[in-house]
Amino acid sequence: MGPLATRGFTLVEILVVLVILAIAGGLAVAVLDRDERGMAAREAKRFAGALEYAAARAQSRNETLGVTADRAIRFWRREPNGDRWLPLDDDDTLAAHPLPEPFSAAPFTYAGQRIAGNAIVPLRASGRNEPFAFALVSPAWRVMLAADPLNRVTIAGPVAIAP
């Protein structure tokens, strides 16, 4: 080495290290995103917010809305002149939301009684809704979402499901 030689890293070496760090960071995010318990909590919060928003919208627009859940959360609007339910497609917040694998959801109770899994739970324009509950489940976790007559949604869980 001569007197003008300097020690350091070349641009290529620095770029290789940055690529390795980016790949490791991407893998870490992918692993963390697969945390079922965390996903259950996030999906429950999203669903609870959508339920409260839908109840407020039903009151403010004087319309009856409904909600169903299975592999996706769907909101419906009841025709004013009939008994038909139409998919609600004019609101991004209430657009159909597919649940990530392996989650599913179902109505659990309505007005204190068990309810069929394919039932539409109504959200009345008057704001006087019966209490209802939905279950959000995966093979390992269960979250219960319960709405009271004042349209406040509480979240219980995630709770581990015994094998």
Predicted regions and their residues:
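N-terminal helix-rich module
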Residues: 1-3, 12, 16, 23, ...
